[in-house]
Amino acid sequence: MKNIVKIEQLELASAVVELGKKVGAGLAAIGLTGAGAGVGIVFAAFILAVGMNPNLRGELFKLAMLGFALSEAVGLLALMMSFLILYS
């Protein structure tokens, strides 16, 4: 009887750990929404600025690409953390 109880407790503990991994990975993936919003803001500002002053398009495009890269880097870090939590 004691062995059965220990096995059930071990299975319950294993299920709780798996649940914690899935919840943690989901919470870590929330950072991807911020990256998506950041990219949208960067390109909205770029389009608005080019509309106001088309002569600065080349300079503004470089800055927009820099903003895009930084926003996506944060999103990729969030995705990496999510995968690390889920598969480790």
From Swiss-Prot:
InterPro entries: ATP_synth_F0_csu (IPR000454), ATP_synth_F0_csu_sf (IPR038662), ATPase_proteolipid_c-like_dom (IPR002379), F/V-ATP_Csub_sf (IPR035921). Belongs to the ATPase C chain family. One of its GO terms (molecular function) is lipid binding. It is a multi-pass membrane protein. F-type ATPases have 2 components, CF(1) - the catalytic core - and CF(0) - the membrane proton channel. CF(1) has five subunits: alpha(3), beta(3), gamma(1), delta(1), epsilon(1). CF(0) has three main subunits: a, b and c. It comes from Dictyostelium discoideum (Social amoeba). Mitochondrial membrane ATP synthase (F(1)F(0) ATP synthase or Complex V) produces ATP from ADP in the presence of a proton gradient across the membrane which is generated by electron transport complexes of the respiratory chain. F-type ATPases consist of two structural domains, F(1) - containing the extramembraneous catalytic core and F(0) - containing the membrane proton channel, linked together by a central stalk and a peripheral stalk. During catalysis, ATP synthesis in the catalytic domain of F(1) is coupled via a rotary mechanism of the central stalk subunits to proton translocation. The chain crosses the membrane at residues 30-50, 66-86. Its main location: mitochondrion. This is ATP synthase subunit 9, mitochondrial. It holds the Pfam family ATP-synt_C. The lineage of its organism: Eukaryota, Amoebozoa, Evosea, Eumycetozoa, Dictyostelia. The keyword Oxidoreductase does not apply. The record marks 72 as: Reversibly protonated during proton transport.
